[in-house]
Regions:
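A SAM-dependent methyltransferase catalytic signature shared across enzymes that methylate proteins
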Residues: 138-142
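Conserved acetyl-CoA-binding loop-helix of GNAT-fold acetyltransferases
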Residues: 89-91, 97-111, 133-137
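GNAT-family acyltransferases
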Residues: 1-86, 91-94, 110-111, 115, ...
Length: 163
């Protein structure tokens, strides 16, 4: 199986991705696969969180395979007062269907478990799709609906990982 790595995004990397993405491959030795950042609004949010002092392990990650950035995702922030974290992810269209999202999400679930998080949550569009399959494979269960400012109604998913 192909090794998938999740690499925390640094402030410097986020700034380059946001303002000078054409410089990223030469600076970091990683090719950006077109479409790796399906939700570009996540990048400024991640950059601001890092500048505000959110620890990198609770922010965004590059999903890499060999020397390519194939996706982007991670946590939306540190655990809340109830011990929950939320994850999100996207994979470049040309690299989908290869298990990369499942491998990345599994890595974040394991990281959350190691830090004593009680539950990992995620949201998907309200229809069966590859992302719902990723979450089901990892043991997430659908836990109702929520309203997303950009997407409207979404399905809420939860995986209990601690006590």
């Amino acid at each position: 199986m192909t090794r998938v790595d999740v690499v925390p995004v640094s402030v410097e990397q986020a700034e380059v991705l946001l303002h000078r993405p054409d410089e990223f491959p030469e600076r970091y030795g990683l090719t950006l696969v077109p479409g790796f950042l399906e939700f570009p609004e996540a990048l400024p949010h991640s950059l601001q969180a890092l500048r505000d002092g959110v620890a990198a392990e609770w922010s965004s990650y590059l999903i890499t395979v060999r020397d390519e950035v194939v996706g982007f995702g991670g946590f939306t922030g540190p655990p809340d007062e109830e011990g929950r974290v939320e994850i999100g992810y996207s994979i470049a269209p040309a690299r989908r269907g290869r298990g990369y999202a499942t491998a990345a999400a599994r890595a974040w679930v394991e990281r959350a478990r190691a830090f004593g998080v009680r539950a990992v949550t995620a949201h998907t569009l309200p229809a069966e799709n590859p992302s719902t399959g990723v979450l089901r494979r990892l043991g997430f269960v659908r836990d109702g609906e929520a309203t997303d400012a950009d997407e409207g109604t979404v399905w809420r998913w939860v995986l209990r990982v601690g006590s």
